[in-house]
Amino acid sequence: MGRTVVVGDIHGCYTELLELCDAVALHPDDLLVSVGDLVDRGPSPAEVVGFFRSRPNSVVVMGNHERKHVRGVLSYAQEITRLQLGAGYADAVAWMRTLPYFFENEHVRVVHAALVPGVPLDEQREEILCGSTSGEKALAGIVPTGHWHEHYTDPEPVAFGHHVTGREPLLRDGRVFGLDTGACHGWNLTALVLPGRTVHAVPAHADHWSVTRREWQLPVLRTRPWRDYTWPDLTAALSRTQDPWLDEVAAWAELLRSSLPALVAAAQALARELPDAALRAHPAAPVLFQARTGRLDEAALARRCVTPRRTLDLAAALGVPLPDLPGNQSSTP
């Protein structure tokens, strides 16, 4: 009968995962269990997900990072993973949706983040098991002092991740095993092998999260809805991050906002030239009617052109050439 091998938070560290499997001499008969957080922060989430999906005798517990993808709560790390997974992202998230919140066999209990001592696993709250923000708040109200595992007295061993314990795992009484040793931060990837309860680790090859953040900053920035931000929201988004490309975006936005006098002049000229029927059929008809009746000025146009896209669309309708978002080949004619 095979062993049970429980691996701490992998976070896209595929090379280290393979090395750890070699270090424990993983056999096809061994059950491989992940505490969750396969993805985010590391360089190879697609490979890690593919490894567990394709390997027989494998179990992945729902981590808070998988739960973020399942619920569509995408912050910077999740946006990077979405781009890394590319066309396979939706399929990967559909698979994540099927993950259990805990695992238990005759050797060990496995959760991602925490459990309430004394409560059966099938009665635990999912948000506590996976370590979501709401779950951590709820747990703090139930276990007000110390860490939950300091109050754990059940005879069954419990393995978990979520909270980085440092380069070394958290080991207590031969029953409590905290296995997140910061692989994505350049520390170690750790496994617990049962029934012997031995611990094995391999060092990370780099501070992967620092590297991944730098490498994917521009691709993530390019996915932002820059054309559809309101001007105040666009200004706020530009202020949050520094990147040379954002300097180009800021200059582009300023150019669009400064185009209002030219757009007013173009609308007034067109309103004078077009016959009534053509004006009514024109895509910029509301603006042209304002111009014809003398009610169009920069302030009135600014109330319409509240986003770059609306400004570009109006410019295209009026025949005023304006550049599209930097990095795009298209522009309004």
Task: Please provide the spans of the model-predicted regions.
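Acidic, His/Gly-rich catalytic cores of divalent-metal-dependent hydrolytic chemistry
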Residues: 136-139, 146-332
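Core catalytic region of metal-dependent phosphoesterases/phosphodiesterases
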Residues: 3-7, 12-79
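Active-site neighborhood of divalent metal-dependent phosphoester bond hydrolases
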Residues: 45-110, 116-146
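Active-site-proximal beta-strand elements of phosphoester/diester hydrolases
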Residues: 3-11, 108-114, 177-179
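Divalent metal-coordination and catalytic microenvironments
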Residues: 9, 37, 52, 63-64, ...
